[in-house]
Amino acid sequence: MKILVDENMPYARDLFSRLGEVTAVPGRPIPVAQLADADALMVRSVTKVNESLLAGKPIKFVGTATAGTDHVDEAWLKQAGIGFSAAPGCNAIAVVEYVFSSLLMLAERDGFSLYDRTVGIVGVGNVGRRLQARLEALGIKTLLCDPPRADRGDEGDFRSLDELVQRADILTFHTPLFKDGPYKTLHLADEKLIRSLKPGAILINACRGAVVDNTALLTCLNEGQKLSVVLDVWEGEPELNVELLKKVDIGTSHIAGYTLEGKARGTTQVFEAYSKFIGHEQHVALDTLLPAPEFGRITLHGPLDQPTLKRLVHLVYDVRRDDAPLRKVAGIPGEFDKLRKNYLERREWSSLYVICDDASAASLLCKLGFNAVHHPAR
């Protein structure tokens, strides 16, 4: 049994070798010749999986180690009788922590308190729900918009997108990309929406590039609209609008979900799905794969305020480390993908063990996802 795996899927070679012969390949462009005798294909979002790639090939199963699936033609796979699995929620924590790192940086730079801001969350799936929970743990007001979930009657106080635009100081997008249909998200943030944002608002896109109309956004910024922008995703990736990058406050190379934990979850989820598909079901404990974190433990004295939270968050991950490299190479062919391929190891907040002498600080840090314990000062 031959299994092709994306060379940037951590732990894939070790895990899938339990099931068959493993060959690691680049995801973009994928070497088509390797598909001629392969039984399974494991990809990331950079690989377009469709009829033109797989027609006439012996592939029986496709797994994507990503939460999003807009790069996969699921309807064709089903029609062709090819098994499929994604990894929903695998990188949700990573994306939430990317958003926090960005907001805390902007808050420090511009001198505002997040506690005084209202955050509008568009898309309340795995990422949006976790972001809401962490913001509300801090006492930060949130507004939710998710028409599909609202129409299904899912639990939640859902508001219209127009209301979020009018009321939110921070608007962050966490939707799939739907190019048509009743819940179309292509250019959901169009020129009209962008121009309607509150003066001084923060716009964040860490889902799919085309959810925000990049041309319209650049037009508004060039005209002097007072707006802070965080973009991790871009229309036309791996190409991007270099002039837009120059205008945004934070720009990164589609790496919001790139924690070691998130990548490992993606790999293990598709591994478990494929093992079940072939009748040799196996399960993997994530902590048996991960290395020891760079910082073993830290001691925190006193309560948790915004500056202290910012220092803790940036000790684990400061978004600026990913902004600067993209600006250096933007517009050079191939460099966007190189940044992703050679991404520096990044951990999640749970990797940091925090000893607190303040019980409320320990409790709050746990709610935020840190590995925190309370030890009273002696």
UniProtKB/Swiss-Prot annotation:
Q: What is its main location?
A: cytoplasm
Taken from the UniProt entry, a GO cellular component term is: cytosol
Report the locations given in the UniProt record: Cytoplasm
Binding-site positions, substrate: S45, T66, Y258
Q: Which UniProt keywords apply?
A: Cytoplasm, NAD, Oxidoreductase, Pyridoxine biosynthesis
Q: Which CDD domains match?
A: ErythrP_dh (cd12158)
Question: Could you say which enzyme class this protein belongs to?
Answer: oxidoreductase
Catalysed reaction equations from the record: 4-phospho-D-erythronate + NAD(+) = (R)-3-hydroxy-2-oxo-4-phosphooxybutanoate + NADH + H(+)
User: Which pathway does the database say it acts in?
Assistant: Cofactor biosynthesis; pyridoxine 5'-phosphate biosynthesis; pyridoxine 5'-phosphate from D-erythrose 4-phosphate: step 2/5
Active site as annotated: R208, E237, H254
The Gene Ontology terms for molecular function here are: 4-phosphoerythronate dehydrogenase activity; NAD binding; protein homodimerization activity
EC number annotated for this UniProt entry: 1.1.1.290
The UniProt induction remark is: During growth rate.
- Superkingdom per UniProt: Bacteria
- A Pfam family matched in the record: 2-Hacid_dh
Kindly list the biological process annotations in GO that this record carries: 'de novo' pyridoxal 5'-phosphate biosynthetic process; pyridoxine biosynthetic process
Q: Which PROSITE patterns match?
A: D_2_HYDROXYACID_DH_1, D_2_HYDROXYACID_DH_3
Locate the residues binding NAD(+).
D146, T175, D232, G257
State the protein's purpose. Answer: Catalyzes the oxidation of erythronate-4-phosphate to 3-hydroxy-2-oxo-4-phosphonooxybutanoate.
> HAMAP family this protein is in?
PdxB (MF_01825)
Q: How does it assemble?
A: Homodimer.
Which NCBIfam families does this UniProt record tie to the protein? PRK00257.1, PRK15438.1
| Family annotation (PANTHER family) | FORMATE DEHYDROGENASE 1 (PTHR42938:SF9)
Q: Which family does it belong to?
A: Belongs to the D-isomer specific 2-hydroxyacid dehydrogenase family. PdxB subfamily.
Q: Under which name does UniProt file this protein?
A: Erythronate-4-phosphate dehydrogenase
Origin species, per record, is Escherichia coli (strain K12)
Classification of source organism:
Bacteria, Pseudomonadati, Pseudomonadota, Gammaproteobacteria, Enterobacterales
